[in-house]
């Protein structure tokens, strides 16, 4: 459960990334594909090379969805309902991949905003990303 302080920390971080959605999203995906190559199996039709237009476009979608969840932090399930349906019913993404993506996102935040990622903010972001992952996997059951 996200506390009021967690919510404030998450909103603070996401206020810094809105103008970098494509860049940070693509970097998160590239990092995930490199670190966890098994995640590439969901993107057989993508050019997965650095700088790929497809990775940039999908990265922007990922970052935009995370921003949407942060903007509706009191109703993440409502904000991501359609995305949850898509991943559970059509794409059938292995739920562990959401955790891997979250870890890569935290690394990207640490690289670009090291002073903002205090231990407290890191913990808040981790809780938020777990909440997002739980929402995205809730319709698998």
UniProtKB/Swiss-Prot annotation:
One of its GO terms (cellular component) is haptoglobin-hemoglobin complex. Residues 1-141 form the Globin domain. Heme b binds at residue 87. GO terms for biological process: hydrogen peroxide catabolic process. Pfam families: Globin. O2 binds at residue 58. Keywords: Heme, Iron, Metal-binding, Oxygen transport, Transport. Red blood cells. InterPro entries: Globin (IPR000971), Globin-like_sf (IPR009050), Globin/Proto (IPR012292), Hemoglobin_a-typ (IPR002338), Hemoglobin_oxygen_transport (IPR050056), Hemoglobin_pi (IPR002339). It comes from the Eukaryota. GO terms for molecular function: haptoglobin binding; heme binding; iron ion binding; organic acid binding; oxygen binding; oxygen carrier activity; peroxidase activity. Belongs to the globin family. Heterotetramer of two alpha chains and two beta chains. Involved in oxygen transport from the lung to the various peripheral tissues. This is Hemoglobin subunit alpha. It comes from Eudyptes chrysocome.
């Amino acid at each position: 459960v996200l506390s009021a302080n967690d919510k404030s920390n998450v909103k603070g971080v996401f206020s810094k990334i809105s103008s970098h959605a494509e860049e940070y999203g693509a970097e998160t995906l590239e990092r995930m594909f490199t670190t966890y190559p098994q995640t590439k199996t969901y993107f057989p039709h993508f050019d997965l090379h650095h700088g790929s237009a497809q990775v940039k476009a999908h990265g922007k979608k990922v970052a935009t969805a995370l921003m949407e969840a942060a903007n509706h932090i009191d109703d993440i399930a409502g904000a991501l309902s359609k995305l949850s349906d898509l991943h559970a019913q059509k794409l059938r993404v292995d739920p562990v991949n959401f955790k891997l993506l979250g870890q890569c996102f935290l690394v990207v935040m640490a690289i670009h905003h090291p002073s903002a990622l205090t231990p407290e903010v890191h913990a808040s972001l981790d809780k938020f990303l777990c909440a997002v992952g739980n929402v995205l996997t809730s319709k698998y059951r």
